[in-house]
Amino acid sequence: GRYRLVVAVVFLITYMVFFLSSLSVGLARLNRLALDQWQAESIVLSEYANKNLIASTLKEEEYSRLFQGDSIAALGQTSAVANYEDGTDKLNAQVFGLSWDSFLAPDIIEGRPAENAYEVIADKRLQQKGVKLGDQLQLNGSERLYQVVGFTEDNSFFTQPVIFMDLDDFRELKYGSSQVKNISALVVKDSQKIEETGLSQLSMSDFIENIPGYQPQVLTFSFMIGAMVLITFLVLGIFMYIITIQKTHLYGIMRAQGIASGKIIASIFWQIFILSTLGISLAVLALLGTQLVLPASMPFYSDWRAYA
C-alpha cells in the first residue's frame, strides 16, 4: 500500500510537470512558428523599433541598396481582424507581406499558390475556425476582399495564425497605397552582416526572445515546472525516509546475517528507481492519452527534450 502511494504521488506530479511543459512549449511555439519556418540567421529592423517587428518600418531608401541575391528578403507585417463581407465571424490574425518567389514564401498543404492580386495563403488554424478555400475575407474593415486560395501549416506569430499576401497588396492594406514602398523588416538567410544608419540587425534567437510577452511567459512556466520538480524530489525523499525508518529493524537483521551495508543501501536506491520509473511511465502514457483527446485549438505540444 505504501509503495502504491509513492507511485501515485510520482505519477500525479510528473504528469503535471509534463502537462505544464507541453502547454509552455505549445504557447512558445505559437509565438514563433512562422519565424522558425524561414530558417534564417538574422533580421534587420528599424533601430527605433526596440527589437520589435510590430513597431518597425523601413523606408525604400533605407533598404533598397541592401538586396544581394536571394539571401535577403523583404517582409511586411501588420495585425489584422479578418471577417466575411457581412461582418460576421471576426478572427484575429497576423498579416505577412512578401514576395512569392522569396525564401519566406510558405509551403502550401492545400489549395494552390497565389497567382493574382488580392489572393492570400492562410495558416490552417483559420481553417479550423471555419475559413474555407475560396472564401472572401475583409481585413481591418477594408472594402477590398481577399480570397483564400491556399492553406499552409505551422505558421503563427504572436500566437495568432498568419495570412500571407503579396507585398503590394500588403502595402495597400497597411499604408493605403502600393506606391508606398515601406516594409517592416529584411530577413537575412545567411550570415552576412548589414551595417546601415538607422537599422538594427538581430540574430533570430535575440529577435524571438524580444517578442512582447514571450520571455515572461517562458520564465513563468519554467519556474512553475522547476518548483514542481523540486516538490517531486522532496515528496519522494520523505516517503523513502519514512519507509526506511520503518524497516530499520529489518536492516539490522540483514546486517546480523552478514549482508554488506553497500548492498542494503543499493537495494534502497533500486526501490526508489523502480518506483520512480513506474510512476513516470504511467505519466507518459497518461500524457499520450491526453494529447489524443485535447482539441486542435489547444496550444499543447509534446517535446521530449523539454521533459528531459
What annotation goes with each model-predicted range?
Residues 1-18, 211, 269:
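N-terminal Sec/SRP start-transfer signal
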Residues 12-19, 23, 232, 236, ...:
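Hydrophobic alpha-helical membrane-associated segments
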Residues 29-82, 92-94:
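Membrane-proximal extracellular/periplasmic loop immediately following the first transmembrane helix
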Residues 76-78, 91-99, 106-169:
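Hydrophobic secondary-structure segments that place a key small or acidic residue at a functional site
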Residues 142, 151-228:
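Mechanotransmission and gating elements of multispan inner-membrane complexes involved in transport
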Residues 195-249, 253-254, 265-269, 273-274:
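Peri-transmembrane interface segments
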Residues 273-308:
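Short helix-loop junctions at transmembrane helix boundaries
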